[in-house]
Amino acid sequence: AIGSKALTVWLSDGSNFPGQQNFTRAFERYLHSMGEIYKTLPDDWRLFSEHKMYEPAFYSTVVQDWGTNYLIASTLGPKAQCLVDLGHHAPNTNIEMIVARLIQFGKLGGFHFNDSKYGDDDLDAGSIDPYRLFLVFNELVDADYRGVKDFHPEHMIDQSHNVTDPIESLISSANEIRRAYAQALLVDREALETYQQENDALMASDTLKRAYRTDVEPILAEARRRTGGAIEPIAAYRASGYREKVAKERPESKSDGGAFN
């Protein structure tokens, strides 16, 4: 119904104590199960495996990092690729380099966009580290610029909206994702490559920051207008009264919010 031709699998398999799980056998079971799914996948579909460092298990996770994820995708076959959730990494992980590696070897399937401070926080995209989001898109735009073959990563949002209107957060996140993309398009690729070849670290970094500091909001607003959208989408959403309307139509919850009812 929605035209999807990709299946993402994230499993919480892992352990909380040393010795609780045999690492090798656990991974063998994972590969076997994914292999069964892969065999039934239509020829024009892709299978994405997703890594996550920890949680709900805190000692080990079967698919804990991009290296294991790459092994999975390589073992299963050409229809298998890696999905990168920005929040599924340790703080300060160089996610943009992971993206570059997966692009280089044809195994970047797509993204779950969000943001984080400590771990898998599932905060709104661009709310904590918008520069990192820009650097990720810099790698995507660079791949397009270099003409990487069969490069069609999927873009998804995976967030948890606990203190905001979920629709408003999704609108804001979509805007931040588009902003990072627009800024990445402004990078002077020829100049950047020259500085990289000359090992001019300062000017190479400045080339990226110059694009990042550019105010692209007027471009984004005009793009929304040309496609029939609102120039100020959150203001338009609030003025529509949609939230109040659906709140009246929503059935009353019979739960008191406790764990036991």
Predicted regions and their residues:
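Gly/Pro-rich active-site loop or hairpin
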Residues: 20-21, 59-67, 89-154, 158-175
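C-terminal extensions of enzymes
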Residues: 163-261
